[in-house]
Amino acid sequence: LTVTGCIDERSDLSPLLSLSGANTLVLDLAGVERINSVGVRDWIEAMRRIPADIAVYWDRTAVPMVCQMTMIANFHGHSHIRSIMAPYYCNTCDLEHQFLMTVDKALTSPPYEAPSFDCPDCGKPMNFDEMEEDYFASVAAIDA
């Protein structure tokens, strides 16, 4: 199931709960642009209502979703985070770019350090554009 756009008071999260006969739910969250406070409340409620016997996986988890996980302990429900989008910024050419990272032991073990990437436009090293410790520690805590 692909979730895109803004998660807010106009969002219909009912497809997350239309799981008759399913034992797995895979969410592609790369298209989530932002989430407001009403969206956070509704998202947490939707995650809570997914039966515990359904395996839930988040793929390509967008930056706004990862940021919410850093602040709200139960934001993910009983989901497993398989991959995240990581924000980077190039000081040389002013490019913002997100790289896909698979969640594995290297990413979720202290010290939390963002891998280095070169800018796809100018080839210079890019800077991770969030607080590494918070960003990666929140993901690490999911399956701990």
Regions found by a protein language model. Name each.
Residues 1-82:
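Amphipathic alpha-helical interaction surfaces in cytosolic regulatory modules
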Residues 67-144:
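Cys/His-clustered metal-coordination modules, chiefly Zn-binding fingers
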